Amino acid sequence: MHSKPSRLPFSLALRLTFFISLSTILAFIAFTWFMLHSVEKHFAEQDVSDLQQISTTLSRILQSPADPDEKKVSKIKESIASYRNVALLLLNPRGEVLYSSAQGAALRPAVNSADFSEHSRARDVFLWTVEDTARAMDTGSGMKMETYRIIASSGQATFQGKQQNYVMLTGLSINFHLHYLDALKKNLIAIAVVISLLIVLIIRIAVRQGHLPLRNVSNAIKNITSENLDARLEPTRVPIELEQLVISFNHMIGKIEDVFTRQANFSADIAHEIRTPITNLVTQTEIALSQDRTQKELEDVLYSSLEEYNRMTKMVSDMLFLAQADNNQLIPDRVRFDLQSQNSLKVFRVFSEALGPKETPILLLKFNGMPCLVEGDPQMFRRAINNLLSNALRYTPEGQAITVSIREQESFFDLVIENPGKPIPEEHLSRLFDRFYRVDPSRQRKGEGSGIGLAIVKSIVEAHHGRVQVESDVHSTRFILSVPRLEKMIPDTQCWE
C-alpha cells in the first residue's frame, strides 16, 4: 500500500507576502468603508438640516394670517427655489391637494404608507423611493427610481379663505448624492484593486530583499563539506534574528568536526593497534619457519602468539562494548548496593594483593564506613574501577601509594582514585577519555594499555547517569567517578559479588 506523499509547506516568503498583503489590503478596505460611510453620513446630516430649515420656513409662511393665498404661494415658491431638487405637497385632512410643486406628486404615495402617521407625529426624516415616470418618458430610457428624504408636518393655516388643518410633505431628492456615492464607490474599488496589486508586488520585493541574509547563510552552509569543516559563519555579519541560529550552527559544526577528527584518529589508531600484534605474529612465525626448531622453541612461539591473540581478542571485546555504548545498547542490570560494604571492599583488596608487597605501589583505602547506597550493575562498576586502578598503577612512581576515597555530595557519591606522578597538562585533561588518545604527541603505545580503558570507564559511568572527570596538579592526578546516590537503605540492598 503506497502512502500518500505529504504536501510540502508553503515557503516562508509566500507566507509573509500573503499575511502582510492581506493585513494591508484589509486595512485599506476598512479605510475605504470608513470614508464612504463618513461621506454618506455627511450628506444625510446636510439633507436633514436643509429639510428641517425648509419645513420651518414653510410652516411659518402658511401660518401667517395676514398674507393672502397668492402671496403665500409666491413666498413658498421663492423659498423652494433657493434649494435644489425640493418637492412640496400640501394636503387637507380629506387628502385633497392644497398645493403641489413640480415634483410634489411623487410624494403622494408616501401619505398612504403604514409608517407615515408615526413619522408625521415625530417630525423625523425618512426615505422614500418612487418610480420617476416623467423623467423616464423625457429621456426615453427605462424606468428610473427617485429617492427622497421626506419630513412631514401638520398644523392649521388660513387657506382658500378659511381656517383649516393641513399636512405638509417636504421632500429632498438625494439621487445626486446616491449617484456621487455610487461613482465614488466604483472609483475606490478600481483604485483598491490597483493599489492591492501594487502592495502585493512591493511586499513581495521587500520580503525577498529581507530574506537575502537568510539566503546568504543558506549558501554559506551549502559550501561547507567534510573537507572544510573548520569553516565558520560570522554571527556579527547577520541580522540579530539569525544570530542565535548562526551560533547554534557553528556549535553543531564544531561537534561534527570533532567527531570527524576523532573518527579519523580512531581509524588510524585502531589500524596501528591491530597492525602491531599482527606484525609480531608474522615476524615470530617467519623466524620460527626460517630454520628447524626444537619442540620447546615452537612452544614458546605458540605461547607468544597466544598472548597476541588474547590481546587482540580483548581489544575487539572492548571495541564491541564501546559500540554498544555509542548505540545506546549498553543497558546495565540495576541492583542496589553499598559502595563501602565488606564485599564491595574486596574489589580493592584483591587488586591490592595482586600488586605485591615490594615492586609495585601500595593501595590505600580511605573509607568512613558510612552507608553509600547506589544503584547499578556491579560487574560494570568493577570493570570501570579496575580500569582506573590499572591506569593509576601504570603512572605511579615506584614505592608510592594509590589512594582510593569516597566523598559525599548532595545527590552523588564521588569515588576518587588518586595517584602521584607527573602532572597532566590542562589542555589534555578534556581529551583523556577519548578512544586511543594519548598525552604523548607521538601517540605510541607503551606498556600493556590498549588506549580505550578510560573511554570504557566514561561509557559505563554515563550509562548509570553519572559523570567522570579528572584533575591534575604538581602533586597528583585524581580521577573522580560520580554516581547518583540513593537516599535511604532499601531492604533488598545487595553487595558486589
From Swiss-Prot:
Residues 1-15, 208-497 are cytoplasmic. This is Probable sensor kinase SilS. The modification Phosphohistidine is found at residue 272. Gene3D superfamilies: 1.10.287.130, 6.10.340.10, Histidine kinase-like ATPase, C-terminal domain (3.30.565.10). InterPro entries: CusS-like_sensor, CztS_silS_copS, HAMP_dom, HATPase_C_sf, His_kinase_dom, HisK_dim/P_dom, HisK_dim/P_sf, Sig_transdc_His_kin-like_C. It is an enzyme of class 2 (transferase). It catalyses: ATP + protein L-histidine = ADP + protein N-phospho-L-histidine. It comes from Salmonella typhimurium. The chain crosses the membrane at residues 16-36, 187-207. It comes from the Bacteria.
